Amino acid sequence: MDEEKRKIAVQAYYGMCSFMDSNVGKLLTELKQCDIYDDTTIIYASDHGESLGNRGLWGKMTMYEDSASIPLIIKGPNFKKNQMCKTPVTLIDLYPTIFDILSLDHVASEANIDGESLRAIANKTYDKNRCVLSEYHGAGSYGGAFMLRMGDYKYIYYVGHQPEVFDIKSDPNEKRNLANDPSFRSLVDMLDNALRSIINPESVDEAARSDQKKMLKDVGGIDFVLNRG
């Protein structure tokens, strides 16, 4: 992509952000006019970020902060004002959060669902040992992508490749891969063990690829899909 097209793409993205911001503002104004703003809990989030040309990448599909990090803002009577929570959290935490706010009980089949109420997390001190997981298995990708956040550290593992480890606090742009530094060997091993205590990357990747192959076969094969566009 040449520089002129890149500028147009960035402008379009920022324009969409402004459009979203404007519409959120309209919603908040309406809530205030209806005199229900103070009693309303609002959760603002996104499903993924945007690489926006950084590292020569566009879209999502990676575990770098540009793609994997999202806004998560909660306003409501159950949450303190002007507070930033540094403990790593994930969208999986939204389900128990909503149930907690509404004082609802989980149905039996979902009693052991992952996640923790963000209200509880926000009211606790910074938990540097809390782990959150993200994974990606896009059809056609070279392998499954797995990411573990624990405190300030991020561990990225693409199946079949060497891991990447970043200290997000001191290296927010993720330029220094600590996995390449022998002095961080114990940290890398600890994060790898933490990831594998949650999930088996190789077996999950194999299962995802098997399902994708079956789906392709069911619709006529990869050539049929590519020719259809």
Outline where the language-model segments fall.
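Active-site rim elements
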Residues: 2-16, 79-88, 102-109, 174-182
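Non-catalytic, surface-exposed connector residues within folded enzymatic/regulatory domains
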Residues: 39, 88, 109-112, 189
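A long, amphipathic alpha-helix that forms part
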Residues: 1-40, 101, 197
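Long, internal low-complexity/basic segments
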Residues: 1-4, 178-229
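Structural helix-adjacent loops and short alpha-helical linkers that scaffold large soluble proteins
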Residues: 32-36, 106-107, 185-186
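Histidine-centered active-site microenvironments of extracellular/periplasmic hydrolases
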Residues: 29-83, 90
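C-terminal cap/loop subdomain of S1 sulfatases and analogous C-terminal strand-loop tails that border
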Residues: 48-54, 80, 92-95, 100-168, ...
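Beta-strand elements within well-structured catalytic alpha/beta cores of enzymes
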Residues: 17-20, 24, 41-46, 72-73, ...
